[in-house]
Amino acid sequence: MEELQLQGYLEKDGSRQQNFLYPLIFQEYIYTLAHDHGLNSSIFYEPMEIVGLGYDNKSSSVLVKRLITRMYQQNSLIYSMNDFNQNRFVGHNNSFYSNFDSQMVSEGFAVIVEIPFSLRLVPSSEEIQIPKSQNLRSIHSIFPFLEDKLSHLNYVLDILIPYPIHLEILVQILQCWIQDVPSLHFLRFFLHEFHNWNNLNLITPTKSISVFSKENKRLFWILYNSYVSEYEFLFVFLRKQSYYLRSTSSRAFLERTHFYVKIEHLIDVCHNHFQKILWFFKDSFMHYVRYKGKAILASRGTYLLIKKWKCYLVNFWQYNFHFWSKPYRIHINPFSNYSFYFLGYISSVLINPSAVKNQMLENFYLVDTLTQKFDTIVPVIPLIGSLSKAKFCTILGHPISKPIWAELSDSDIMDRFGRICRNLSHYHSGSSKKQSLYRIKYILRLSCARTLARKHKSTVRNLLQRLGSGLLEEFFTEEEQVISPIFPKTTLFPLHGSHRERIWYLDIIRINDLANYLDWS
């Protein structure tokens, strides 16, 4: 219903409404959409809660209506934000309403800002549709590219993409996407009040954006994605001297989550701040891969060449976005003895020695050869750490019950645990050593059993004796039996050696939540 109301607003006058989104802030269905997105955004089914409170209050339509009424009144929002800042500073116990207002305004405004991005996903009737182009948007399509390219390269730059310290830089970048001036002023006001609260609490600018990203996740990701898009647009070789896969969509928001490129050649980079042309170097074996805040720049060149790339990136962020990128965020590593964590896998280039028997006339001789192979394995220890943070086990990997799910029905509990297991098996189908997933499945299986036992006030042994040991058998379903849109349900793979087969699916458009949780924890 809310989606239809929003669609009706945009269809009244498409060109006018797209550039004037401010009235949507006063529409109740916008906050309903924000609340629904929070409930369905994760495989953990965790509702989005008000910071500092132990229960979900966002579903209250009465509070939303009161918030809209106060925003209509002159200066009421300013007073509400000031009260919120003061209450947080002094630890006031009655700051629920101002706390609620701040987070709901952030969530609702994030939905509104997503509209210009989502409209880009809607093809016009005049555009020519390319069939099956969705297959090129799969995250797994990156790995065949890496298998084909990285095994021939020498060095890799492991990059943590920096972000501006001051939020105003993010707003300035967002102006390229949104032409609605009142909405931008509203965003500046919201960020200004947040900055004032940080000053009261003596929070440094470096920690300020970290606090903002935790309390206003959705709005932060919109600002962050617009910044990354701008950075890659200004990065001249990505725009003019390369090809890349188009970005994927996550629900209604065009989120540039990943793409990869092969740089054919790079001759010069023009830089306004340098007042001159930087003559660069050709490198026909340079490859760039990014997912969210982490990127990889791989080269076949020498150590000196890859070191020049590192210096260039540091200067690029400094002069284009007015902030210093710390050099330790960019690591130079040789592929021969380095493994990197990317997209939920630990990847490396293995050297496999082999001997080939040759015959020349009557003489036989052996020729030793070395081949390089791109290898991907499941990061068991990081996954256990991710399960621990999600309260499925201890930090040592001992399964525990999930108290927040104990109030659900038995079928819902098993469905949620089973869904996580199936997603893990599906996402890590490209691992060369799938046996390591058995430990993760065991943790989830026993955590599910303990959650059911907690609900029925029993022990795990008594529960399994009463319901049968086959109750949780789906947790050990082989990856080859996981239903996928790419392969028919009747497709069977031989079990012998199946744990060594790597399968990359073309229907995965987002990273597994456990791996994603680890990347940003």
Curated annotation (Swiss-Prot):
<keyword id="KW-0150">Chloroplast</keyword>
<dbReference type="InterPro" id="IPR002866">
    <property type="entry name" value="Maturase_MatK"/>
</dbReference>
<dbReference type="GO" id="GO:0006397">
    <property type="term" value="P:mRNA processing"/>
</dbReference>
<dbReference type="GO" id="GO:0008033">
    <property type="term" value="P:tRNA processing"/>
</dbReference>
<comment type="function">
    <text>Usually encoded in the trnK tRNA gene intron. Probably assists in splicing its own and other chloroplast group II introns.</text>
</comment>
<dbReference type="GO" id="GO:0008380">
    <property type="term" value="P:RNA splicing"/>
</dbReference>
<keyword id="KW-0507">mRNA processing</keyword>
<keyword id="KW-0819">tRNA processing</keyword>
<dbReference type="InterPro" id="IPR024937">
    <property type="entry name" value="Domain_X"/>
</dbReference>
<dbReference type="Pfam" id="PF01348">
    <property type="entry name" value="Intron_maturas2"/>
</dbReference>
<comment type="similarity">
    <text>Belongs to the intron maturase 2 family. MatK subfamily.</text>
</comment>
<protein>
    <recommendedName>
        <fullName>Maturase K</fullName>
    </recommendedName>
</protein>
<dbReference type="GO" id="GO:0003723">
    <property type="term" value="F:RNA binding"/>
</dbReference>
<dbReference type="GO" id="GO:0009507">
    <property type="term" value="C:chloroplast"/>
</dbReference>
<dbReference type="InterPro" id="IPR024942">
    <property type="entry name" value="Maturase_MatK_N"/>
</dbReference>
<dbReference type="Pfam" id="PF01824">
    <property type="entry name" value="MatK_N"/>
</dbReference>
<keyword id="KW-0934">Plastid</keyword>
<keyword id="KW-0694">RNA-binding</keyword>
